[in-house]
UniProtKB/Swiss-Prot annotation:
Subcellular location: Nucleus
Keyword Repeat: yes
Protein name per Swiss-Prot or TrEMBL: Myb-like protein AA
One GO cellular component term noted in the UniProt record for this chain: nucleus
Length: 971
């Protein structure tokens, strides 16, 4: 047999509870019973009425078939008693972080940490389970008086029933304050038929008999109270606090099996179980209903302690205050409680209030939406979360679980109620008059805020009515709007974040409870309990709001709008001040010429000649300044009018400023021209060095330098043209000087040395070799971009000084020393020029050799060139190409004419060489771009990539050849 997924005890309980209430109430409540019976079928579409129980359950974990996953848990726990004077402060690590809720007829037999070893009574065996993953629901029927473990059913594809009717039933039970409440908790299957028969008989008797006077009903209530007190004293003497032997131990999670279900079903059918269960529960409930008072009301226990409570919370007395809107039905319960409480307090309005309850029962979906509308109007900070999910919201460590004192049931006094009604009506009239006066004042002061203030006042008027019918009717008119707006946002919010913004209302304490003392709201996060808001004194800007008729949210809403309005006014004032300051600054900065003066035209021309389109940019501010003198518009009434512009007075100042600016511009132009001339001279001198130095600067680098020069010139011209005052020109003059001091390509590359510093690594050397093999030795800038962290100069120097395979690394010879001495006597320390005479030797190597060895030998005269031959072909070629090559002996076509030296060459004497070099005259020929030239004087400079000869011919030489055609004649 399969277990049913519906709650079997709920439909009949509606009749029992309502009939108990009907004993004291008239036939008006019977209409509610009829409507409730029509709605016994569960409504699967609406899920805002669960849980309908007023029980607040403590956290108590239980493993399940998912291996102890806390998301899928059984909803059973220990209820706690409510005490307005007692507060607990328990750390979050004291108890597990779960929150469970059961159906109205569930209380667990498990001893909770708060009760110690004392269990609570078990009115029903039904346990409900939710699944977080799949939005499903199932019910488990377990007999609590047996040791049979309760099976955990698989909740796949099973929907949960709704308990729409239980909400109203429990409301009636709590609010009537009759002694028959003890019998309302007897949820039994066996006696349902008998109870229904008794109910029908009682209803017939009530219809036949006339209504008894109020005094007789008061006497009956007093008798019932005395009987109840006697029963409680008897049960106190007995040891009922001990756990019964036949109660089940801690429920264990066991997988559903076929063997356990027949035992459960068969046990339910036994009449012994039902009778025994009813008797034990009645005894235990009457004993547990009397709470155990604490020694000191205001004491707070330690972190791991809880008060020893052993009583059951009355349904719906504390649920509306302690757990507002755990789900959507929590606030629905509050609204229904208000109506039912008014029925008990105001006997004259029973019929009207009962009609409202009937509407709520027959239209489950509409009542939920109506209540949601109330929440949106009164609880702006309350949010909703997903249904069918375990509620892990309440933190029991910060839960306030005080002990509620038993309320003595007093007879109803009709005169007192009438007096209260009259007082409330008088207060309402006074409030309405004050509100009307305040509305008139607000309309005069704040035109934009009229709509919001009227809405707030209308809401307050509706809340001040004694009959709650007006509120419900207003909400019924807004069902369609709520369905379209709130349903989408209602179920997609995280549960943990839902209670961070909850604010509890205290006004419902008078309506939900029959006692005169209000109960403080439930605190979730161990915060200080909120004090009851004091009635504000009437002022011109704030209406009077009474605590009995208005809510905290209405007051907060009103203050919130006032704060917003003040902020808007402050922002507008700040904006107006900023606009005034900007206008004043524009008037001070912008020169305004005298249109009538003749000097204005001359100045205008000077502007056009020096700075281009400067005058066009200044024409618009003048027009704007002229327009400022006009009176302000209507929408700018608060802004002070700008002062009028006096063009005739400002003409002289404009003329002086324009002359000064023109003089400064002329001076700057002269300085720029001088700087340009200097830079050209430096470039010419550097270009001579660069041409001699070979590929120190690539063609790509030169093109980039020229482009940058053009860009900088444009920037300087635009900066000078855009500046209209002397201050702006003085600020931008240093930039002009920087642009004028343009350095050569060599200095630019040296400035980029900061891009990468440090020694070269092996990886960089290998990468540089591969890039040079691919791209050659002329595109150093491109190679540097591929290499990263190095610039073109660094790459070129690294290649030419270290990585070039043509570099000689052997010892220096006497021939090389003689060539260096001869070249140094002419060129000095121009090592790049000297390196051209020695293929395979770098300028750095020559410089180091000169500084380290050759200077020392020269000072000591240790050189002896006698061992050398008189002259060798290579040396002669070197000397002839570098030292003794006159321009007259060079022809445009290749020839074999001999080369004559103008003086004798004495090899052994170094002084004679210097004299010879002084007598000779050399003229450096201009560079030639043609490939034609004398191949006689070309050297094998492919290794160093220096193709520039003394004639600056770009002829590539592939192999070394002896110059057999060169005839040297000695004079």
């Amino acid at each position: 047999m399969e277990l049913t997924t519906e709650a079997p005890f709920i439909n009949n309980n509606n009749n029992n509870n309502n009939n108990n209430n009907n004993n004291n109430n008239n036939n008006n409540n019977n209409n509610n019973n009829n409507n409730n019976n029509n709605n016994n079928t569960p409504n699967n579409t609406s899920y805002s009425n669960y849980p309908q129980s007023g029980y607040v359950y403590q956290n108590y974990p239980l493993n399940n078939n998912n291996g102890g996953n806390n998301n899928n848990t059984i909803y059973y726990n220990q209820p706690q008693q409510y005490d307005p004077n007692y507060q607990t402060s328990v750390t979050s690590n004291s108890y597990p972080q779960y929150s469970y809720f059961a159906s109205p007829n569930i209380i667990s037999p498990i001893p909770s940490p708060c009760l110690g070893s004392t269990p609570s009574p078990i009115p029903s065996p039904t346990i409900y389970q939710y699944s977080n993953n799949s939005n499903n629901y199932c019910a488990i029927n377990t007999p609590p008086l047996t040791s049979v473990p309760s099976p955990i059913l698989n909740c796949n594809n099973k929907k949960r029933p709704e308990f729409n009717n239980n909400n109203n039933n429990h409301n009636h039970n709590n609010n009537n304050n009759n002694n028959n409440n003890n019998n309302n908790y007897n949820y039994n299957n066996s006696n349902n038929n008998q109870q229904q028969q008794k109910q029908q008989q009682q209803q017939q008797q009530q219809q036949q008999q006339p209504q008894q006077p109020q005094q007789q009903s008061q006497q009956q209530q007093q008798q019932q109270q005395q009987q109840q007190q006697q029963q409680q004293q008897q049960f106190k003497q007995t040891n009922i606090n001990t756990t019964p032997k036949n109660l089940s131990p801690v429920l264990q999670s066991v997988n559903s099996s076929a063997s356990s279900t027949p035992q459960i079903q068969s046990y339910f059918q036994q009449p012994q179980y039902q009778q025994q269960y009813q008797q034990q529960y009645q005894q235990q409930y009457q004993q547990y209903q009397q709470p155990q008072q604490l020694s000191s009301a205001n004491t707070t226990p330690q972190t791991n302690e809880r008060p020893n409570y052993s009583s059951i919370i009355q349904p719906n007395q504390l649920f509306s205050q302690m757990v507002p809107s755990f789900i959507n039905g929590a606030i629905n319960n509050n609204n229904n409680n208000n109506n039912n409480n008014n029925n008990n307090n105001n006997n004259n309005n029973n019929n009207n209030n009962n009609n409202n309850n009937n509407n709520n029962n027959n239209n489950n979906t509409t009542t939920n939406n109506n209540n949601n509308n109330n929440n949106n109007n009164n609880y702006n900070n309350i949010t909703y979360f997903q249904p069918y999910t375990p509620f892990s919201i309440v933190d029991n460590s910060s839960m306030i679980v005080p002990d509620k004192q038993p309320q003595q049931q007093q007879p109803q006094q009709q005169p007192q109620q009438q007096q209260q009604q009259q007082q409330q009506q008088q207060q309402q009239q006074q409030q309405q008059q004050q509100q009307q006066q305040q509305q008139q004042q607000q309309q005069q002061q704040q035109q934009n805020y009229n709509d919001d203030s009227n809405k707030n006042n209308n809401n307050n008027n509706n809340n001040n009515n004694n009959n709650n019918n007006n509120n419900n009717n207003n909400n019924n008119n807004n069902n369609e709007n709520i369905n379209s707006s709130n349903n989408n946002n209602m179920y997609n919010i995280c549960p943990a974040a839902a209670y961070q913004n909850i604010q509890f209302i205290k006004e419902q304490s008078n309506s939900s409870l029959s006692s005169s003392q209000p109960i403080p709201p439930f605190n979730l996060y161990n915060e200080q309990p909120q004090q009851q808001p004091q009635q504000p004194q009437p002022t011109q800007s704030q209406p009077i709001l009474s605590s009995s008729s208005t809510s905290v949210f209405d007051i907060n809403h009103h203050h919130h709008h006032q704060q917003q309005q003040q902020q808007q006014q402050q922002q507008q004032q700040q904006q107006q001040q900023q606009q005034q300051q900007q206008q004043q600054q524009q008037q001070q900065q912008q020169p305004q010429p005298n249109l009538s003066s003749s000097s204005y035209a001359d100045n205008n021309n000077s502007f056009q000649s020096s700075s281009g389109n400067v005058w066009e940019s200044q024409s618009s501010p003048i027009q704007s300044s002229v327009q400022i003198s006009s009176p302000p518009q209507s929408n700018q009434s608060s802004i002070a009018p700008a002062p009028a512009v006096n063009l005739s007075a400002s003409a002289s100042s404009v003329a002086t400023t324009t002359k000064q600016s023109n003089v400064k511009k002329q001076k700057q132009q002269q300085q720029q021209q001088q700087q340009q001339q200097q830079t050209k001279r430096q470039e010419l001198s550097d270009s001579e060095d660069d041409t001699d130095n070979g590929d120190d600067i690539d063609e790509d680098d030169e093109d980039d330098d020229e482009d940058e020069d053009d860009m900088e010139d444009e920037d300087t011209s635009s900066s000078s043209s855009s500046s209209s005052s002397s201050s702006s020109l003085s600020k931008k003059s240093p930039a002009v000087k920087k642009s004028g001091l343009k350095k050569s390509g060599r200095s630019k590359s040296s400035s980029n040395e900061s891009k990468a510093k440090g020694h070269w690594t092996k990886e960089e050397d290998e990468k540089l070799r591969s890039l040079v093999d691919l791209h050659g030795t002329k595109r150093w800038k491109y190679i540097a971009s591929l290499l990263c962290l190095r610039n073109g100069r660094q790459c070129r120097e690294r290649w030419s000084n270290q990585l070039d395979p043509s570099i000689k690394r052997d010892a220096w010879t006497l021939e090389e020393d003689r060539i260096i001495l001869d070249a140094h006597s002419k060129y000095g320390n121009k090592w790049a020029e000297i390196s051209k005479l020695l293929p395979g030797r770098t300028n750095c190597a020559i410089k180091n050799h000169w500084n380290s060895t050759m200077k020392r030998k020269l000072s000591k005269k240790q050189y002896d060139f006698s061992s050398l031959p008189p002259i060798s072909s290579s040396i002669v070629s070197d000397n002839s190409s570098s030292l003794s090559t006159p321009t007259d002996s060079i022809s445009s076509s290749p020839s074999t004419s001999p080369i004559t030296l103008s003086s004798n060459v004495v090899v052994n004497d170094f002084d004679s060489q210097q004299q010879q070099q002084q007598q000779q005259t050399y003229q450096q020929p201009p560079p030639q771009s043609q490939d034609s030239g004398n191949n006689q004087f070309n050297f094998n400079n492919n290794n160093n990539n220096n193709n520039n000869n003394n004639n600056n011919n770009n002829n590539s030489v592939e192999s070394i050849k002896l110059y057999t055609n060169v005839n040297i004649s000695y004079i």
